Amino acid sequence: MPFINIQTIEGLLDKDSKAELFKRITDLFVEIEGKGNPAFREHVWIRIDEYPPEQWQLGSLSPTKQMIELMTS
């Protein structure tokens, strides 16, 4: 039973994007780990955790509200 935890910056994913991620990731795990057995779908757990931009940093760069707006527009 896989548990997939996605961590992302708050505001990057809308409801439709999250639904698409859930579907595609589940499909991938059914295909690979479940060996194509559709019943395996019931055992795939996925969680999306969103964190405010100020809780992220890459090197010395933290995302700003303007950066997020550019990425989502």
Model-derived regions, located:
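A domain-level signal for the structural core that forms small-molecule/cofactor-binding pockets
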Residues: 2-73
